[in-house]
Amino acid sequence: MVVMPPQNSVNESEGRYLQDGFWQHGRFYGSWKPGKYLFPIDSEELNRLDIFHKVFLLARDNKPFLAPIRRTSPRIMDIGTGTGIWAINVAEECLSDAQIMAVDLNQIQPALIPPGFMPKQYDIEEPSWGPLLADCDLIHMRMLLGSIQTDLWPQVYHNAFEHLTPGIGFLEHIEVDWIPRCDDDERPANSAFVKWAELFLDGMDRFNRSVRVIPQEHRQMLEATGFTDVKQEVIKAYVCPWSADRNEREIARWFNIGLSHSLEAMSLKPLIEKLGFEAEDVRELCERAKRETCVLRYHTYCNIHVWTARKPGPQQ
């Protein structure tokens, strides 16, 4: 049965609204094309997505994008916009004359939006992006791993390519590699965070919606699609603020908050529905991982991957 969440679970102060959906495993999920988006859409999840916007800004010198925009009234698409925070940030602070289409499977964007901001509910796994904005200067994609069927990534990149302006259209794609890493072995021998990541990745593989970041595969897919000037950047995000570097500490503070909100939200469905866990066991593992990521002597980090690519002109 489709139900609406209790009124007090909606973050009204930010003018957001939730579409029809359903409760499962103690969280609220969207009901449009159920099973495609495996993570919640409740107010706690909206906060998580906004926290990661801050993480990515800090990791990229407070710049929401790096692609050169050459037209005075650019056309931009934000694919998998979530709360719309990136698109709103660009519209309000960077490109006030831009036409920005914010595309997502779920209608969780705010009711009050800036001029030029166009929310669009659409399934980007469709073979064609016909209804979406064409002739784009920039297409931005972020944290889509797990939301795209694993074998459909070439199709997604192809559709992005087709909707960019030849010669000046750029794609920017950002993902978090959830595999915990450590350069100095300063982490516990039986790490709960490592265990969580292994199970989470395994469960998502079984949904055929992999969250594994394989950098060379994405580069090869972009080049095979026809993109040129393909570049990749890797940024460390420590899970707690132990570093002597001020910027690394600030990224880590926000990443720690985002991670603490992510553990349960992302792993409930894959661990319960694909690996046979009980909900309380998932939450217990997440709590242990959360406590571990707050210990300053553990120097664990995750990598943030950024790919940028350009659609060549007709003579290139």
Curated annotation (Swiss-Prot):
Induction: Expression is regulated by the VEL1.
Entry keyword annotation includes Flavoprotein: no
Alphabetical keyword list: Methyltransferase, Nucleus, S-adenosyl-L-methionine, Sporulation, Transcription, Transcription regulation, Transferase, Virulence
An example Gene Ontology biological process: sporulation resulting in formation of a cellular spore
Free-text function comment from the UniProt entry: Methyltransferase that performs automethylation. No other methyl-accepting substrate has been identified yet. Component of the velvet transcription factor complex that acts as a global regulator for secondary metabolite gene expression. Controls the expression of the gibberellins gene clusters, but does not affect bikaverin production. Controls the expression of the fusaric acid gene cluster. Acts as a virulence factors during infection, most likely through activation of gibberellins biosynthesis.
Family, per entry: Belongs to the methyltransferase superfamily. LaeA methyltransferase family.
Native organism: Gibberella fujikuroi (strain CBS 195.34 / IMI 58289 / NRRL A-6831) (Bakanae and foot rot disease fungus)
Gene: LAE1
Disruption phenotype: Reduces gibberellins production and subsequent virulence during infection. Reduces both the fusaric acid gene cluster expression and production of fusaric acid.
Catalytic function, reaction form: L-methionyl-[protein] + S-adenosyl-L-methionine = S-methyl-L-methionyl-[protein] + S-adenosyl-L-homocysteine
Subunit annotation: Component of the heterotrimeric velvet complex composed of LAE1, VEL1 and VEL2; VEL1 acting as a bridging protein between LAE1 and VEL2. Interacts with VEL1.
Chief location category: nucleus
Protein name: Secondary metabolism regulator LAE1
Compartments it resides in: Nucleus
Keyword field contains Ribonucleoprotein: no
